[in-house]
Amino acid sequence: MDGQRSEGRIAEVIASMSADIVGLQELDLGRARSAHADQAALIATQLGWKYHFHPAMRSGDEQYGNAIVSRFPIELKRAAEMPGAAPWYCREQRGAIWMQAKTDLGPVHIINTHFGLGRTERRLQAKLLIGPTWLGSVPRDEPSILLGDFNSVRTSRPYRLIGAHLRDARALVRPSGAFRTFPTRFPSLAVDHIFVNAALSPTQLSVHRTPLARLASDHFPLVCELTLKRTGCLAAGMA
């Protein structure tokens, strides 16, 4: 990452991934540091895709949060801030966004999130997303994806909480794989994950490590090809 905030580069990376649905974190809307741009809208427009942005944080006219961009029509199911309990020096409001994509193979639920840095808040955030107001309300036979930057490695409690309800695509495709995505300068941590329910079967998983991806973000995209058990293929990713 070179310190520049370029929506065009992010869109170019997404286009090179051949993905159908992408979750994005740490996007700005109206913030001075990104020239007051609506980053989600600019990325989606360059791709010719649909999108929905949810601000986890607001300060005056400035907003900061997560988005889902999709080749397919998408419908907002839920978007909300999540509980936080981090120490003051790393406190930041976190959020999650839940869309239903109307794919060629049928409807698919996608939740994109960005967990906090504190141990307690990550545990609370994991419990929220697997609970009755989020994924717990989705029938088991409806394809569901939970993806994002969880700031949690595979040995952590938040990861294990989610793993008790959903399956990590990595564990199904290549259990021994490291899939380190952060930081792009020297990838040493696997904190980005794609979880799926039993209605989906991951067939491929990779870290999209390219020179442009290294410049576009401090995380490399994690890309997963999924098969809907009753129909066919879908590609999901994070950038």
Kindly give the residue locations of the regions a language model identified:
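N-terminal, active-site-proximal structural segment of metallo-dependent hydrolase catalytic domains
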Residues: 1-46, 51-53, 57-63, 106, ...
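Metal-dependent phosphoester-hydrolase catalytic domains
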Residues: 85, 100-103, 133-145, 151-239
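Active-site neighborhood of phospho(di)ester-bond hydrolases with catalytic His/Asp-centered motifs
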Residues: 23-25, 52-55, 145-149, 168-170
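Catalytic-core segment of enzymes that process non-peptidic bonds
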Residues: 49-85
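Active-site environment of divalent metal-dependent phosphoester hydrolases
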Residues: 1, 29-35, 59-62, 118-121, ...
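Active-site beta-loop-alpha substructure in enzyme catalytic cores
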Residues: 105-137, 141-145
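Beta-strand-turn-beta hairpins that frame and shape the catalytic cleft
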Residues: 62-64, 71-75, 91-112, 226-231
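Active-site metal-binding loops of divalent metal-dependent hydrolases
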Residues: 27, 115, 149-150, 220
